[in-house]
Amino acid sequence: MSSEQREGSQETTTTTVEGNGTIAGQNSHSAAPTTLRATSTMVSCQRLRLNPNNEHRPDSYEDLQLDFPNSVYSSLEKYLPPNMLVSNRDEKIKFMTDIMLRHLPHGERSRAQRHSDYRLKITTNYQPLHKELYTLVPTVCFVPAFLKAINENTEESFRNIISEPSPGVFVFDMLQPSFCEMMLAEIDNFERWVGETKFRIMRPNTMNKYGAVLDDFGLDTMLDKLMEGFIRPISKVFFSDVGGATLDSHHGFVVEYGKDRDVDLGFHVDDSEVTLNVCLGNQFVGGELFFRGTRCEKHVNTATKADETYDYCHIPGQAVLHRGRHRHGARATTCGHRVNMLLWCRSSVFRELKTHHKDFSSWCGECFCEKRDEKVRSIDALRKKLFKPRQTQA
């Protein structure tokens, strides 16, 4: 079967790829490791504020391994009752953790605890090769032009470094070659440790059989900083319609393609609001990303329109940023070995709002066409009504 035929067959049914480095279907906010556990005796009758106290400056939680993403604690702190705002950090953590755990079904709590134990086994036994990777140093990670655009933090500065070769697909140079090399070496070191210890690791998602979850071996804090300080400002400008301004959790991982690895990736959508995909390198042939339009859940398997077709060729250090609901896949890597780092960025606010909406025409290509066609029909009907010819009497 040719690559074109294979791609055509893949487009008949679009898969939603789930992945938190956990059991499929796990809540996206329950995947982070735990060092502090809230007990059932900690239940408080105090209620959260209905509106955030935006004048309050939250504590930093970046130095801790917690039940939920560090950024969730910083965001939730603004909703704490007044007497809790003046409490010490440990008391606030216990209070917030208990609230969030109480809203998890019992099965989810058990899965979260098992995954916490799994991560703890890794972080207490795995010895990092490049410890500098675990704290985000912008000048070490990013190319100067990208840093300059982030520091200026305007739409104009972003557009100066970003191209949009197809609607909703944004491409820009991002990572330093030296950083990519360190990441590749760290991944090799992790896989070597896995092989030597025969430790069974969880794969990134439900489609990739190879690769690793970066959050599981200690890079979650670094990736949180990457999302909050560098991806969210860009997403606020280009993906405001899918919660780009309110990204508050992530799933970070690497995937590997080539000989003795995954070969290609079928047509799918991601479990994210915004996806960052960066090629880390190694020599390879093939592996192009093919994009086929953004769709809501209702229209995920509808036909692709001519202007929605785009193929992207990977370049080491170059980033691709797109909506998670942008349908895509990866063609076969026919030679060599390709490694990509992905960050699925999620917004709990957008996910909650989405449950109350049916019109996604601002980002779903099919919803947009349906709304446009309905508008045309309404105008035609009104025109016929207003300009209905008068009947002459005999």
Swiss-Prot record:
Residues annotated as binding 2-oxoglutarate: R338
Cofactor note as given: Binds 1 Fe(2+) ion per subunit.
Knockout or disruption consequences: No visible phenotype under normal growth conditions. The double mutant seedlings icu11 and cp2 skip the vegetative phase, flower immediately after germination and then die.
Tissues and organs where the protein is expressed, per its UniProt entry: Expressed in roots, cotyledons, rosette leaves, cauline leaves, inflorescences and siliques.
InterPro entries cross-referenced by the UniProt entry: Oxoglu/Fe-dep_dioxygenase_dom (IPR005123), Pro_4_hyd_alph (IPR006620)
Pfam families: OGFOD2-like
Bias-annotated ranges (Polar residues): 17-35
Keywords, alphabetical: Dioxygenase, Iron, Metal-binding, Nucleus, Oxidoreductase, Vitamin C
E.C. no: 1.14.11.-
Chain sites annotated for binding Fe cation: H268, D270, H328
GO molecular function, one term: iron ion binding
Superkingdom classification of source: Eukaryota
Domain Fe2OG dioxygenase as annotated: residue spans: 248-347
Location relative to the cell: Nucleus, Nucleoplasm
PROSITE patterns: FE2OG_OXY (PS51471)
Required cofactor(s): Fe(2+); L-ascorbate
EC category name: oxidoreductase
One GO CC term on file: nucleus
Stretches the record annotates as Disordered: 1-35
Keyword flag Oxidoreductase: yes
Role played: Participates in the epigenetic repression of flowering genes in association with ICU11. Functions in the repression of several members of the MADS-box transcription factors family, including SEP3, during vegetative development via histone modification.
Name under which the protein is recorded: 2-oxoglutarate and iron-dependent oxygenase domain-containing protein CP2
Protein's organism: Arabidopsis thaliana (Mouse-ear cress)
